């Protein structure tokens, strides 16, 4: 099969991911179909299957492109979720749309399957930041990773991604996320996870 053309506009994956979030904002994940996706994106089915094996594969790619791996790096360096440096990160161009898409992934139209994809992505980012694999963790460390990732997703799920809409003011979206970032339990949890993974990395180096 020949490679799909790119005439200088958004690539097929970019169009498919944009269509995915548009559909997911109005349709439960289990009701999103390949036919609806390719129609919304303006591509053909061959183009979809050139890039992805199925809807879950697209969801993983979309999640990878949305989750802010930079936050794990900043927190690992000793900062808190509410720090000025993290605030500056959220105010970079395009960040509000990434946040809006993240809220869609964890919102009312998500499912246990999709939340699992998001949770695994969050966990993989934290593990990669410390040079770890899941098998490097002790049971209590793995439990901490699961707990903090799940808690962060639970907090995000409380924010309605449609409160501003796709064309709404990004400042409101960022203000809502700033409120979440200032919650003390999130600060404590993020610091605890960073310390836990730091200990796991030190133990791995000593083995």
Residues covered by each model-derived region:
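C-terminal peripheral helix-coil segments that are non-catalytic and often amphipathic
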Residues: 128-131, 161-207
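Helix-turn-helix
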Residues: 23-57, 61
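Hydrophobic alpha-helical connector segments
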Residues: 73-107, 111
